[in-house]
Amino acid sequence: LEANRKKIDFLGFSFHLDTVSVLERAVAMENCMELFEEALARDFEPRVINIGGGYKVNYLENEQDWNDYTSALKEAVLGTRPSMTWHNNAFGMSSDKGKLKGNFNSYSYFDTQTGGSFLQELLSQRFPNLGDATAGSIMQGNMIELWIEPGRSLVDQTGITVARVNSVRMSSRGEPIVCLNMKRQDISFLDQEIFVDPIIIEKHDEEGARQTEQDSQSKEEPIGVYFAGNLCLESDLVHRHMTYLDKLPSPGDLVVFVNSSGYFMDFSASTSIMQPVAEKVAVMERDGKFTWVMDKQYVPFWECMP
C-alpha cells in the first residue's frame, strides 16, 4: 500500500463474517480499529469501517414455540418420540448411546435481538485494549464512517412465494406427500430448512363451492404431511420436516410461503430440467389500493412520496 499510495484511495477496513455472534463481530471491529491506528501512523487517512451484514430477523412471534419445536426434534433424534422428519433427518445432530451429539444446523427462527437492536448491541460493546470505550463512542469521537450491508433484515415480513398443488400421494410408509409445481431450490437458502408453516389457499369453483375427496376425509386431529417438489428426486423435498395441517390439500390449491423475500424466494433458484425460474411480481399500495406489475417492470416511486 505504501508503495502505491498515490494510486489508491484508501478508505479503511471491512469484514463480513459468517456468524451472528455479537462477541465475534466485536473482536473483528476492535481489530479494525487497531488497524486504523496503524494506518494513521503510516500517514494514510482511513475513514470507513464496513461491518457487513448479518442483522437477524424473527420468523416466529413466540420464542417458546421455537424452543418447544427444537426440543421435540432433539427428542426424535434420541428416539424418545416419533420421528418428525423425512427418514428421521437430524439436521446435523445424531444420537450416540442415548446422548445427543452434533449441532442443530439451522438459522434461529426466533431471537431476542434483531435488526437495529442487534446493531445497537454491537456498537455498545466495550474494547479493553482501547480504553474500555464502546465501539460507537470510538467511531463517533474519531469521525469514522460506519458502513453496513443489511440483507434479509431490510425486507423482514415481506415477500411471499406461491406454489400450486399438483397432486397428493402416499409414501411407502403411508405418509401424505403434497407435490407442488416448484422445487426445493425455489424456496431454499443454501439448502437450509425452512421451519415456517405455509398457508393453504383452497381452490373453489365459480360458485364458490369446494367438494373434494380430501374434504370428506377431514379429521379432527391435524394431519402430518411432507411438501415435495417436481424434480422426481427424493432430495427435492421442499420441507424435510413434517408439516401439520387441518386437512389434506387438493390439486389446484395454493401453498403460500410467507416472509420469503430475505434470500429464500430465489437465492438458489435454477432452471433444472428446463423449468424457467418463477416470475416475480411487485405489489404496491397507493391511495389505499393495491396494484401490481411484473418485477422487471417495477420502478420505485420515491418522487411521489411526501
Predicted segments, located by residue:
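Active-site-proximal beta-alpha core segment in soluble small-molecule metabolic enzymes
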Residues: 1-50, 85
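Short connector loops at secondary-structure junctions
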Residues: 11-16, 47-54, 215, 219-228
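Glycine-rich beta-strand-to-loop/alpha-helix junction loops that act as flexible
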Residues: 16-18, 49-58, 89-94, 150-152
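Short glycine/threonine-rich loop-to-helix capping motif typified by GTGT followed
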Residues: 21-28, 58-70, 157-163, 240-245
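Short linear functional motifs in flexible/disordered or boundary regions
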Residues: 25, 44, 61-63, 85, ...
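Glycine/serine-rich loop-strand microenvironments at binding/catalytic pocket rims
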Residues: 40-51, 62, 93-104
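Active-site neighborhood of glycoside hydrolase catalytic domains
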Residues: 41, 73-77, 81
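Charged (often Lys/Glu-rich) extended helix/loop segments that serve as interaction or gating elements
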Residues: 72, 83-306
